[in-house]
Amino acid sequence: LGGSGGYSRIMYEALKQTDSPYVLYMDDDISIEPDSILRALALSRFAKSPMLVGGQMLNLQDRSHLHCMGEVIDHNAFMWTSAPYVEYDHDFAEYPLRDRENSKNLHRRIDVDGNGWWMCMIPRETAEKIGLPMPLFIKWDDWEYALRAAKAGYPTATIPGIAIWHMAWSDKDDAIDWQAYFHLRNRLVVASIHHEGSISGILKSMAKATAKHLLCLEYSTVAIQNEAIRDFLAGPEHVRDLLPTALPKIAAMRKQYPDAVVLPSATELPRTTGEATAYGMNIPTNPITKIRSLGAAVVNNLKPADPRHHEVPQANYPPLQARWFSLGRVDGVTVTTADGRGVVYRQRDRDKMIALAKESAALVKELRARFPEMRETYRSAHADLTSKESWERVFGID
């Protein structure tokens, strides 16, 4: 059932089978101290009025680092981002709380719009009033629920001293792997329900991301994000029906692209020529060098790729060097996955890039034209999608 299906089943059973006053959501790949649960429970009990109590995220592989302190929604691009005054990736080992100069922001109040479901305690009253999560499988179900709860009078607080350890986003490829489909599709679904006004900021951020993916030879990412737009435009019933089939569909699509095929090691391929190694080391640091690098990347992408580099890589890049300014100037390189489990062989294909770009532009144009219609459609279906009855049909409960 994935994230939202699993979380929805938890809430459904908690409401049906127990009289528990709270539902605690946590990821299954975290490390936690029991004190965090006790603190979340204590704060929930003593809150003046019911509220969602969220935990912060510490870096599982660098345990003194506070990876996520508190987040809000950027209502222009409709994307989550760090809340004002938060300290991103704060290292308590180097700057403890008593360090007044470097830790002062950790002592101030941080207001958030929601909290990730790596750890979040939800009052029973909230669930009984606003319903279950949306059938989104993974990504954005937590934010949709927080925004819905806030509208119903149940705010979220992310509390210092309540936290879990979780793998940092920088150690994952979820912005470019199969999860990229759910990131975009569900972002559009939630925006249609909770975003007011123009979507120009959303479309601008989408266009920028697509251009970056194409320059980085991430063709599979663009292909599945195009599919995400199509599935969003197909409507809420279609999105719910996709719960059991979306992941295998996306996995099959990705297999058609070399950038999505993970090889155990770069040694599976011929030794690199090394001619593109320097591109990953020379990071543009000022506007002039950035413009020059962008120009070189665009010019390179307008030319047909040299087929030799689809047989012998020009370089092996670690994730930190696999950026637009390096990948945009090559025809074929291997890139290590963020989690280190292997490499992908990214191969530039001008015709494929142009086809994906045209497809994306046409879909974005349709999205702009039809978004007011989709906004009405998704809002009309919202109550049904989050109802116990809807989820009973998904679960196969008579």
What is the meaning of each model-derived region?
Residues 185-398:
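Terminal low-complexity segments of carbohydrate-biosynthetic enzymes
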Residues 155, 165-183, 224:
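Nucleotide-sugar-dependent glycosyltransferase catalytic core
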Residues 9-22:
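Active-site nucleotide-sugar/metal-binding loop of Leloir-type enzymes
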Residues 34-88:
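Conserved donor NDP-sugar-binding/catalytic core segment of glycosyltransferases
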Residues 111-119, 124, 128-147, 153-159, ...:
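Donor nucleotide-sugar recognition loop
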Residues 20-31:
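Short beta-strand-to-loop acidic/aromatic patch adjacent to the donor-nucleotide binding site
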Residues 85-119:
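A recurrent flexible, glycine/aromatic-enriched loop bordering the glycosyltransferase active site
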Residues 1-9, 31-33, 139:
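A short, glycine-/small-residue-rich helix N-cap motif at loop->alpha-helix starts
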